[in-house]
């Protein structure tokens, strides 16, 4: 049988990425052009800046991805692209490039949900067994997803306010840490003690919903009040206390979901899945199901994960027309 090569595009936020997947599971290339340095001075992603950067580098990313994969444009079988959720301007750059490539070469266009990409990045570790449960944690999302089969995603719980990664970045900014702050907070947390009593919202409620706005506000108030009084707080202890509260919330809801949905596999994915503290808690506390976490290189935004997620869409012949548009608020269905 002739080999299949999927060329995948990811431009939902501040990473321009193009990847090539051979058949179902051989990632030949995964080129990522990061914009973090451009956004650091703003303390967050500036949509207009992100879009301009995507335009500047996407052609070079395509060329590099094909070269690294050792194939030519004529070898590509299909084109996959993130069409949401994300920043509308950023999404449109990737969509335009993907549609142009597919149209020029007469190839099918595969639409991929960005969060499905994060989830299916776990396929790079080992073949996934369904049904499974996934905890998706990133800068824009915190949700528990039940996956009955590849491509069938249902939200069973999600945040009511801030995403967990967003909370990390906001408290990081208060402490004067560099954006994005997640990795630095994680490192500092391992050097400090959990001595500050931060709230764990909804942790005892019998649902699968998350809330991080109260925790974020409590942190900011503590830090602000200490500054007003001229008191010095240990950054390491602040980080340790904040992270302990975050992980308590994530673990409580995840374990509750595993009780409600008896599955054999838990996938933990998204940018926050790179968090060392979270990985340690999962290893220690979730021992009765298989826990699969994508490798660090596939935790952040990348086109490799979009390629993995596109396989199930290819198998279902779920192809898009040339009128495919960006859907910045695209979401999985909610479990009824």
From Swiss-Prot:
Q: For this entry, list what GO says about its biological process.
A: tRNA threonylcarbamoyladenosine modification
List UniProt keywords, sorted A-Z. Answer: Acyltransferase, Cytoplasm, Iron, Metal-binding, Transferase, tRNA processing
Question: One GO MF term, please?
Answer: iron ion binding
Task: Give me the reactions it catalyses.
Answer: L-threonylcarbamoyladenylate + adenosine(37) in tRNA = N(6)-L-threonylcarbamoyladenosine(37) in tRNA + AMP + H(+)
Coiled-coil positions: none
Query: Under which EC number(s) is this enzyme classified?
Result: 2.3.1.234
Question: What's the family?
Answer: Belongs to the KAE1 / TsaD family.
Entry-linked HAMAP family:
TsaD
Name of the featured protein: tRNA N6-adenosine threonylcarbamoyltransferase
What organism is this sequence from?
Streptococcus pneumoniae (strain CGSP14)
Protein's gene: tsaD
């Amino acid at each position: 049988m002739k080999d299949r090569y999927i060329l995948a595009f990811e431009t939902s936020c501040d990473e321009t990425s193009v990847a090539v997947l051979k058949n179902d599971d051989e990632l030949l290339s995964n080129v990522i052009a990061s914009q973090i340095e451009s956004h650091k001075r703003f303390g967050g992603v500036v949509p207009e800046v992100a879009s301009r950067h995507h335009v500047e580098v996407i052609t070079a990313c395509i060329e590099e991805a094909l070269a690294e994969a050792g194939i030519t444009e004529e070898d590509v079988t299909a084109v996959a692209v993130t069409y949401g959720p994300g920043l509308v301007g950023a999404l449109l750059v990737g969509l335009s490039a993907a549609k142009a490539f597919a149209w020029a070469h007469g190839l099918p266009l595969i639409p991929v949900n960005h969060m499905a990409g994060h989830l299916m990045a776990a396929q790079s570790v080992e073949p996934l067994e369904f049904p499974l449960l996934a905890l998706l944690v990133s800068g824009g999302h915190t949700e528990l997803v039940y996956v009955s089969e590849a491509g069938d995603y249902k939200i069973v719980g999600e945040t009511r306010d801030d995403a967990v990664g967003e909370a990390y970045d906001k408290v990081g900014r208060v402490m004067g840490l560099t954006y994005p702050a997640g990795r630095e907070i994680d490192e500092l947390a391992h050097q400090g003690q959990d001595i500050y009593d931060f709230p764990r919202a909804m942790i005892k409620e019998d649902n699968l919903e998350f809330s991080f706005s109260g925790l974020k506000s409590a942190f900011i108030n503590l830090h602000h009040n200490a500054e007003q009084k001229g008191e010095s707080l240990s950054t390491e202890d602040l980080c340790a206390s904040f992270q302990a509260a975050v992980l308590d919330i994530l673990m409580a809801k995840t374990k509750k979901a595993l009780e409600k949905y008896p599955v054999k596999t838990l996938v933990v994915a998204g940018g926050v899945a790179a968090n060392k503290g979270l990985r340690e808690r999962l290893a220690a506390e979730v021992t009765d199901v298989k826990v699969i976490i994508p490798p660090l290189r596939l935790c952040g935004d990348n086109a490799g994960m979009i390629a993995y997620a596109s396989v199930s869409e290819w198998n279902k012949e779920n192809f898009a027309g040339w009128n495919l548009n960006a859907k910045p608020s695209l979401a999985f269905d909610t479990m009824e």
